[in-house]
Curated annotation (Swiss-Prot):
Gene3D superfamilies: Urease, gamma-like subunit (3.30.280.10)
Organism superkingdom: Bacteria
Enzyme class: hydrolase
Homology family: Belongs to the urease gamma subunit family.
GO molecular function: nickel cation binding; urease activity
Signal peptide start-end: none
Catalytic activity: urea + 2 H2O + H(+) = hydrogencarbonate + 2 NH4(+)
InterPro entries: Urease_gamma (IPR012010), Urease_gamma/gamma-beta_su (IPR002026), Urease_gamma_sf (IPR036463), Urease_subunit (IPR050069)
Species: Ralstonia nicotianae (strain ATCC BAA-1114 / GMI1000) (Ralstonia solanacearum)
This protein's name: Urease subunit gamma
Subunit structure: Heterotrimer of UreA (gamma), UreB (beta) and UreC (alpha) subunits. Three heterotrimers associate to form the active enzyme.
Protein localization: Cytoplasm
PANTHER family in the record: UREASE
UniProt GO BP: urea catabolic process
Length: 100
């Protein structure tokens, strides 16, 4: 199977998000890469589902709270930018203060 670099990046984010979901389900607090992957994957999936950029900018702030992540992780992530594929093309989604 041949994948473009962009497709490989999406697959890596999805895999990291899946691992983060499993760890979260076991009651573990997420670290920096797990938190970023989980939020990024949710945004990419929301774009595929047809949600708008504005909807996803808000949705990205509801996925995780400070209680879901290790100490200091929320401060390490001032914003997350994701290039997501929407029905009408690729757009950049920026989520400010994703973990509150």
């Amino acid at each position: 199977m041949e994948l473009t670099p962009r497709e490989k990046d999406k697959l890596l984010i999805f895999t990291a998000a899946l691992l983060a979901e499993r760890r979260q389900a076991r009651g573990l607090k997420l670290n920096y890469p797990e938190a970023v992957a989980l939020i990024s994957a949710a945004i990419m999936e929301g774009a595929r589902d047809g949600k708008t950029v504005a909807d996803l900018m808000y949705y990205g702030t509801t996925i995780l709270s400070r209680g879901d992540v290790m100490d200091g992780v929320a401060e390490m992530i001032p914003d997350i930018q994701v290039e997501a594929t929407f029905p009408d093309g690729t757009k950049l989604v920026t989520v400010h203060q994703p973990i509150v």
